[in-house]
Amino acid sequence: MRRILSILVFAIMLAGCSSNASTEKQHAGGEKTVKAEPQSTSSQKDSTDDYQPNSQVTDDRTLHKVGQTFSDDKGKAVLKDIKQVNKTYKIGDVELTVKEMKLIHLRPDYSMIDYFHELTHDEEFDFVKVFVDIKNTSTKKVNVAPIALMKTNTGETFDWNKDIYLEELNGELEGGAEKSGNLGFIVNASSGHAHDKAADAEKKTKEIKWIEITTSDVFDHNHKKISDAQKIKIKF
């Protein structure tokens, strides 16, 4: 139900993002690659303090070194790669801080299999997790999504409704308000179709070396676009 509600509430914002992408060929405006501003050391320490346990995905707060594992009632997670990013990107009046990026191998508990079957038929899989903070620096309400699209070096592209965390980071943000949370996307997953086995095997041999995030456009309370979507590339 949460996924359905997210789709309904956020449809207008995605339409704006898609429209912006289609007009990119006509002019040099639209999506831009933004320059990051590094955070202070104190801000970096806040990344785990801001974390809120998720009802679908295994807690990864203790995973700081490649090879470390953690198990809970939602499954078993193994850390495959990690990048402390701690950079802030400005999208008009919105500040998006990417705090941390992880590549995690997850074997969900049996009780969670049905949830993940919407996205993959694999019993275990890798996913890229991005921990972000998003802040509205203006006094007026805006609508924005920190990740409307995500692309990897392997050629896969995901839109926002493939997010496995569902922490309601997309949508309205009141003036001066701030949200923190996770977004995660299953990568190199098998399709579940026999004729795609060769392609699935090839994808699994590819390492995730970088991701490219495209935010949504920023809209005001009347759903009028006030800032263009931005592209952010992050390497492991």
From Swiss-Prot:
Biased composition (Basic and acidic residues): 24-35
Signal peptide as annotated in the record: 1-23
Keyword check for Signal: yes
InterPro entries: DUF4352, Membr_lipoprot_lipid_attach_CS
Organism the protein comes from: Bacillus subtilis (strain 168)
Region (Disordered): 22-62
Keywords associated with the record: Signal
Coiled coil ranges: none
UniProt lineage: Bacteria, Bacillati, Bacillota, Bacilli, Bacillales
Keyword Signal among record annotations: yes
Protein name, as recorded: Uncharacterized protein YdhF
